[in-house]
A protein has these predicted regions:
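Catalytic phosphate/metal-binding cores of nucleic-acid and nucleotide-processing enzymes, i.e., regions
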Residues: 1-106
Length: 106
């Protein structure tokens, strides 16, 4: 959702040297991801109650979005419910398929 995407943008902008923003038109035909700003990378966000489903489904969608965007890399950010004493940003996980990870480290 919008709130989670804004949160992810703020965290990535804080923790990386890049200015990350929400992509206009996310979710439309030929989707190219939810966020922009990390070079050559498609970023998909998921803030689902069923985080296991998000971990399985969203990286597959991110891969199609990577192809649509003609980018080299795709990552999925999955937001988990904050736990007590959770550090700033620690309720997010970066998820990739094995193929996506292999492409990243080549």
């Amino acid at each position: 959702g919008d709130k989670a995407e804004r949160e992810a943008c703020a965290l990535l902008s804080e923790f990386t040297p890049y200015e990350v923003e929400r992509r206009f038109g996310a979710g439309m035909e030929n989707d190219k991801g939810d966020l922009v700003g990390i070079p050559d990378t498609v970023i998909q966000c998921a803030n689902w109650k069923d985080t296991n489903a998000a971990v399985l489904q969203k990286p597959r969608e991110a891969e199609q979005q990577r192809i649509n965007a003609k980018a080299n890399y795709a990552v999925t950010l999955v937001r988990y419910k904050k736990r007590p004493n959770c550090k700033h940003g620690d309720n997010w996980r970066v998820v990739m398929t094995i193929e996506q990870y292999a492409r990243l480290i080549k």
